[in-house]
Curated annotation (Swiss-Prot):
NCBIfam families the record matches: L11_bact
Complex and partners: Part of the ribosomal stalk of the 50S ribosomal subunit. Interacts with L10 and the large rRNA to form the base of the stalk. L10 forms an elongated spine to which L12 dimers bind in a sequential fashion forming a multimeric L10(L12)X complex.
Entries under InterPro entries matching the protein: Ribosomal_uL11, Ribosomal_uL11_bac-typ, Ribosomal_uL11_C, Ribosomal_uL11_C_sf, Ribosomal_uL11_CS, Ribosomal_uL11_N, Ribosomal_uL11_N_sf
GO cellular component, one term: cytosolic large ribosomal subunit
Function: Forms part of the ribosomal stalk which helps the ribosome interact with GTP-bound translation factors.
GO molecular function: large ribosomal subunit rRNA binding; structural constituent of ribosome
The family this protein is said to belong to: Belongs to the universal ribosomal protein uL11 family.
Pfam families: Ribosomal_L11 (PF00298), Ribosomal_L11_N (PF03946)
UniProt-listed PROSITE patterns: RIBOSOMAL_L11
Claim: Manganese is one of the keywords in the record: no
Protein origin, superkingdom: Bacteria
GO biological process, any: translation
Protein name, UniProt field: Large ribosomal subunit protein uL11
């Protein structure tokens, strides 16, 4: 008989930096999951990413308190800011622009995010990432 799923927990944890402190500890502790086991497995799986990069993770908790987890690609906003070398986007994106990004760089980000996005094709995903860039106060140029 298959294990029954008790809960899904969605978190954003820095790559290689999962530890029992909030937000990881309380979220997993409520469901009775072994926190240190998750932290060790997550840190091992995210070694290939740049340390400190936020990694979305979906943890599936089963009724016997075991778990599995799936890591996603970093958020598009983080990848865009990293590409232009900024710490944060604009507080007023329509009036205050904070940087420019090439369309080719946006397409690279869309290709990186393709596994997690539900776009019909790479062009649609690129347009979606361009919209994210504009909402952050970045100008997309050819």
């Amino acid at each position: 008989m298959a294990k029954k799923i008790e809960a899904y927990i969605k978190l954003q944890v820095a790559a290689g930096a999962a530890n029992p402190s909030p937000p990881v500890g309380p979220a997993l502790g409520q469901k009775g999951v072994n926190i240190m086991e998750f932290c060790k497995a997550f840190n091992a799986r995210t070694e290939k990413f740049e340390k400190g990069m936020p990694i979305p993770v979906v943890i599936t908790v089963y009724n016997d308190r075991s778990f599995t987890f799936e890591t996603k690609t970093p958020p598009a906003s983080f990848l865009l800011l990293k590409a232009v070398g900024l710490k944060s986007g604009s507080g007023r994106p329509n009036t205050q622009k904070v940087g420019t990004i090439k369309r080719s760089a946006v397409q690279e980000i869309a290709e990186t995010k393709a596994a997690d996005m539900t776009g019909a094709d790479i062009e649609a995903m690129t347009r979606s990432i361009e919209g994210t860039a504009r909402s952050m106060g970045l100008v997309v140029e050819d």
